[in-house]
Amino acid sequence: MLFQIDHTTASVTDFTVREVPFNVVAPFIEKWHYSHSAKGQSPKHCFALMHEGDMIGGMIYGFFAMRNQWKKYSVYGVDDEFEVIELRRLVCIDETPRNTESYFIGQTIKWLKKNTNYRIIVSYADPHHGHAGTIYKATNFYHVGMTSPGKIIDYNGQRYHDKCIRDINKAHLRKTGERIPAQSAVRLINALESGEAKMVETPGKHIYVMPLNKKSKKLIVESLVN
């Protein structure tokens, strides 16, 4: 569907933000996000940006992909994995007014402050895809560093984290105690060996954090000063 918004009259204040189920926002993310994927997001809170009955933006907040990743942010007052949430997917259609994304993020931050006990939001901007985090700077996130360079697997137009080739068959492990590769891992390994897939080195990602309480904000600011 092609959305037409009159830039001369439309304002971000004409838009509404709703919390929606994952299955409502996922098709929108798959259509409009550069990754064309909503899989593996560990979704916890999903939001839709609406205009005159049409969804014009989608956002997914979820828990970290790696279980102990939250510990990196304990220096900002995070005591367990349920006190930090990651902004994992954000996209709006092209035909939206300036500042639409920052308005969208701002409204969801207000919602999270009011309805949850998270201490910080974390998001990553990937230079490999031409992103430096401009939208996060515009919404007053703090840039706190870079992740280490990594590798991804490019296969059939999809990109997979290189850890996917180390996934194990959990059902087999529970049944026999034997560790064997998951079928998805075997498929990627075979594709790499045949040349159908390739391993691509990627630069580190920009790390942005948004404090949701005064204590975390103080700790973030102090860490940047020091």
PLM region spans:
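Short hydrophobic/aromatic beta-strand or adjacent loop that forms the aromatic wall/cage
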Residues: K44, P203-Y208
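A short, polar/charged loop/turn motif at coil->beta-strand junctions and beta-hairpin connectors
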Residues: S11, N23, M55, D79-E81, ...
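Core catalytic DNA strand-manipulation module of type IA topoisomerases
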Residues: E196-M199
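Conserved beta-hairpin
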Residues: I29, P43-F63
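Acyl-donor binding region in acyl/amide transferases
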Residues: T16-E19, G62-S194
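Short amphipathic alpha-helix that is part of the acyltransferase structural core
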Residues: L2-S42
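Class I (Rossmann-like) S-adenosyl-L-methionine-dependent methyltransferase catalytic domain
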Residues: L192, T202-P203
